[in-house]
């Protein structure tokens, strides 16, 4: 118990020392999906896992929050699939295709994030599974905030609930695969050094330094995130709540909301994660598994195979 508490404390302190907020929004879920989609060979699958997580590498620096170029090359949008440049530029030798396979699988046009944020398969049809669950969580979180004299505009409240649902989803993935934390760590440690250059080659020379800096911080954060998951559900919930509170306070201010005290935010975050766990307990894995089949078919249809 003391060992677990010490590791969780270290996780929170190290993340809190980062220059910008950093939190993995559904990284374990993406890593789990990559394990179902990709190759059985360990080094290939480790790079696929890293690639699928790394599409979110810019998410943790608010200066890129509304950046259309970042969205185009990491997640895409209707009729805009800049992320495919990573696949097109990846060489067949080494692990570049493994990285690119995972990276492209993440996209929001026909990849993993489509079912989370656009159109769910088993739940949340028309809005996306995560968006649907976040919307359901909003009244409870609004009531909790209101009991302390705070309120958020609906778009900001939805964004906060979205992050709570994704954190809860990763806890449910941990229940399904107790080794997911180790798999995230190994993906970060074994990832090919080609990744930053591969993404920069798609985004263009002007983005090279930004990609290198963001990827360095992202990789460090993912190692810590995986370490928190290795400690089991309760320590992970507390670690996630600790840092989601830090992220949430800054995100709410960034989006024009009130300055919520950090101590209050910690309690709200933990309560929100636990409520989200109850909302997602029965149908999260069915949606994730349906997403695996959906993405596998779409990868083949778009010529993404190796």
Residue ranges and their predicted role:
Residues 1-8:
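Positively charged n-region of N-terminal signal peptides that target proteins for export
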């Amino acid at each position: 118990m003391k060992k677990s508490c010490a590791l969780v404390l270290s996780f929170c302190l190290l993340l809190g020392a980062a220059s910008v907020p950093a939190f993995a929004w559904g990284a374990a879920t993406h890593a789990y999906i990559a394990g179902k989609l990709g190759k059985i060979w360990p080094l290939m699958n480790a790079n696929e896992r890293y690639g699928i997580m790394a599409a979110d590498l810019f998410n943790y620096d608010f200066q890129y929050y509304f950046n259309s170029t970042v969205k185009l090359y990491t997640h895409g949008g209707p009729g805009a699939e800049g992320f495919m440049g990573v696949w097109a530029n990846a060489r067949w030798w080494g692990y570049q295709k493994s990285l690119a396979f995972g990276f492209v699988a993440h996209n929001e046009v026909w990849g993993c994030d489509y079912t989370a944020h656009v159109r769910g398969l088993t739940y949340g049809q028309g809005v996306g599974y995560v968006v649907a669950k976040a919307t359901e969580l909003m009244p409870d979180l609004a009531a909790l905030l209101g009991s302390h004299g705070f309120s958020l505009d609906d778009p900001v409240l939805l964004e906060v609930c979205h992050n709570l649902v994704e954190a809860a989803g990763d806890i449910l993935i941990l229940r399904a695969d107790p080794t997911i934390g180790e798999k995230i760590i190994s993906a970060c440690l074994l990832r090919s050094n080609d990744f930053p250059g591969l993404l920069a080659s798609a985004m263009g020379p002007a983005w090279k330094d930004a990609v290198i800096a963001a990827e360095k911080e992202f990789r460090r954060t993912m190692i810590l995130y995986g370490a928190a998951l290795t400690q089991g559900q309760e320590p992970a919930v507390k670690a996630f709540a600790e840092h989601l509170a830090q992220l949430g306070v800054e995100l709410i201010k960034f989006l024009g909301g009130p300055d919520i005290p950090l101590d209050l935010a910690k309690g709200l975050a933990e309560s929100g994660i636990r409520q989200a766990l109850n909302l997602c307990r029965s149908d999260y894995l069915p949606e994730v598994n349906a997403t695996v089949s959906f993405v596998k078919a779409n990868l083949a249809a778009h010529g993404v195979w190796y």
